[in-house]
Amino acid sequence: MLLETDASRNKPSSYIPLCGSDNSCGGLWCPRKGGKYSCISMTCDIQEDCPKLVRCKDSPGPYCMEGFCTC
């Protein structure tokens, strides 16, 4: 029996967005193409979901709070 994993789709951490927080943003403040930033929301079920989706700049985290990743 062959077990298939997602290992082939794993990307280095440099491909995971480096986000932060902003007082006017209720989600994550993340860079977009062209150097602009935008407020985005990433859902999560468990704490281990968030580090696969986002990295946090200048703050601990990311962590899952009330179903959303936050820094």
From Swiss-Prot:
Give GO terms for biological process.
defense response to fungus; killing of cells of another organism
Q: List the disulfide bonds in this chain.
A: 44-64, 50-69, 56-71
Whether Protease counts among this entry's keywords is no
**Keywords linked to the UniProt accession:** Antimicrobial, Disulfide bond, Fungicide, Plant defense
Any keyword NAD? no
Q: Which family does it belong to?
A: Belongs to the DEFL family.
| Designated name of the protein | Defensin-like protein 292
